[in-house]
Amino acid sequence: GMTERKVIQVAEKQNRDYFYIDTGYMGNLHKRKDFHRVVKNNVQHMKPRYDLPDDRFKQIPLSMSSIRFRGWRRADGPILVVTPSAKPCNFYNIDRDTWVEETLSEIKKYTDREIIIRDKGLRRERVGDFSVPMQLVNDNIHCVVTYNSIAATEAISTGVPAVALAPGAADELCTKTIAEVESPYYPDEEK
């Protein structure tokens, strides 16, 4: 995981290929993690690979209805800020409290909406009825703001737009600036 930052830095300094394995971007809403990501020379995939066959990817929502995209929800509720956990903060050398303070201040420049803060918490506090997708629906969330969390991918797959402030796997489907929090990006549903 991200705790191997020093090993990754050595590999990069020596121009060695490495593979990073961590929790997958979707389908992990229960106690058991069914999906993982394997990334070459990075900790996240940065761009979709349209050159690869999509047959396996298309089979996933057929077997797991919880991750089937059902269209965009256009809710008029609060903004959900999903804070980065200690691992990405350490890896990217950011201070979580400073990030939260600056992010909230920036959001308030562009909206009067209520802001709900969600910290990562223990795994048992993040699955089932307590998962991000459940909160998005139950709290009628307008938009998610996060650093580079899997929460951006979960939001999009639930039909809620996301603002992801650092590079990550959901970049092609996210707004990248808080200034657009009131009118976030709703990509074409075919993407």
Regions found by a protein language model. Name each.
Residues I8-E12, N93-I94, I156-T158:
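Short amphipathic alpha-helical segments
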Residues M2-E4, G24-G27, P84-P88, G121-R124, ...:
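Short, solvent-exposed loop/turn segments at secondary-structure junctions
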Residues K108, R113-P167:
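Donor nucleotide-activated moiety binding/catalytic core segment of transferases
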Residues G1-V43, S131-Q135, A151-A152:
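Active-site and donor-binding regions of nucleotide-sugar-utilizing enzymes
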Residues H30-D76, E172-K191:
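Leloir-type glycosyltransferase catalytic cores
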Residues F69-R124:
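Conserved catalytic-core segment of nucleotide-activated headgroup transferases in glycan assembly
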Residues R5-K6, T146-K191:
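Charged, low-complexity C-terminal accessory regions
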Residues G1, Q9-E12, D17-G24, L80-V82, ...:
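A structural signal for short, well-ordered beta-strand segments and their strand-loop junctions
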